[in-house]
Swiss-Prot record:
Lineage, top ranks: Bacteria, Bacillati, Bacillota, Clostridia, Eubacteriales
Organism of this sequence: Clostridium novyi (strain NT)
One protein family per Pfam: RecO_C
Keywords: DNA damage, DNA recombination, DNA repair
Record protein name field: DNA repair protein RecO
Similarity annotation: Belongs to the RecO family.
GO BP term, example: DNA recombination
SUPFAM superfamilies: ArfGap/RecO-like zinc finger, Nucleic acid-binding proteins
One CC-aspect GO term: bacterial nucleoid
Length: 256
């Protein structure tokens, strides 16, 4: 298990999900800064006087002291940095928080470490908490960062067929994850609007912090969502479910 860490170590981590285990314990899935996604046991976490009650709630972010056992990690100590429990009082923020956690659970292998992705993940939670950015733009930006970090990066600047710089296109290759120039055959992909292509290109190369500067219509947001939903569905073994009902309700609002 792991790669070169001591049997007991401290790492920043956020809880992705929990599951009751035996009479008094919990299984906790964490996205950690040092070793990526892991599952750990929190012994006694279900007891009313447990020191782990608050620190084993979904979305809790803190410094976790983990012990590496033969087949499972265990949580020894926790210092909470931010519980992010305020996200639970708003349907939008709880849905997107759950979605970000679900993406990590689906996209990352056990102990697949990526510190840059971890930073973007935690930043996304602070943007959710402060509602300092359009949540759909935040989600699309994080999706693009995740796809890139897990080996499914795009090239919106150069043609994915011939490698020449793209001046203008609205065609995406499903196989090669990128734009196709006007000189190359357009097969095995699909057309999108020029506006949606521009949004994808901007969000892909910008930082999470700067994504808020772009203004996007609801129509283009919906188009970009469908594009990335398709790529996420084909890239990973499971399709995330957290946004499906939520987006159905949102689309109903737009159409009223």
């Amino acid at each position: 298990m792991g790669d070169g860490f001591l049997s007991i170590f401290k790492t920043k981590a956020l809880i992705l999900k929990t599951q009751d285990y035996k009479e008094n314990d919990k299984l906790v899935w964490l996205f950690t800064e040092k070793i990526g996604k892991v599952c750990a046991i929190a012994k006694g976490a279900k007891k009313s006087k447990s020191k782990f009650i608050a620190s084993t709630q979904t979305f809790c972010f803190g410094e976790y002291v983990l012990y590496r056992g033969k087949s499972l990690y265990s949580i020894n100590e926790v210092e909470i940095i931010d519980s992010f429990q305020s996200l639970l009082s708003d349907m939008d923020t709880i849905t997107y928080g759950s979605y970000f956690c679900e993406l990590i659970l689906i996209a990352l292998e056990q102990e697949q470490s990526d510190r840059e992705l971890f930073k973007d993940f935690i930043k996304s939670f602070y943007f959710l908490k402060n509602q300092a950015m359009d949540l759909e733009i935040l989600a699309r930006t994080f999706e693009l960062k995740l796809l890139k970090a897990t080996g499914y990066g795009f090239d919106f600047e150069k043609c994915c067929i011939c490698g020449k710089r793209i001046n203008k296109t609205n065609y995406l290759s499903i196989q090669y994850y990128g734009g196709v120039c006007d000189n190359c055959e357009k097969t095995g992909g699909f057309k999108i609007s020029y506006a949606a292509y521009g949004v994808l290109k901007f969000l892909y190369k910008t930082s999470i912090e700067n994504a808020h500067i772009i203004s996007v219509s609801n129509e283009i947001k919906e188009e970009v969502y469908k594009v990335l939903d398709m790529f996420i569905s084909q890239s990973y073994s499971k399709k995330p479910k957290s946004l499906e009902i939520f987006n159905y309700l949102k689309r109903s609002e737009y159409n009223e």
